Amino acid sequence: MTKRNLQAHSPESPPEWYWVKGLHDAHITLVESFEFPFDYDRYTREKNTYDRNCLTLTLDAAGAMFDTSVKAIRLYNYKYLTPETTLEGHGTLWWIGDRLTVSDGRFELEIHLYDGEAFPEELTVRIRFERAEVER
């Protein structure tokens, strides 16, 4: 199992949808989770052949320090790796930083966030997913 670490300063080429410049100080305005209905006709006993769920992060990146073009991030077939810390149920969330890694054809996104209404104020969420779409 090889694991590649992709960050803004990494010499490796990140995926085309990744926000290479960073989203520091972007505001997460909405977090939506959606479970797709199971399609028995398309099921081939292989897990990666269909979309099971989607996590959509709607952002206001106008105040971000670097990349202000990102409007929404969709993570397909996601799973929280930090089940005690998720993105749902928080007040105002601010993006501090992130790290994207690739392992066995899946992505892992570790997001560092700030929630001024929670204790502790800073939190880290790790999410594994199979593919992503970024709306700019």
Q: What do these predicted ranges mean?
A:
Residues 1-136:
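Surface-exposed, interaction-prone regions used to assemble/regulate multi-protein complexes
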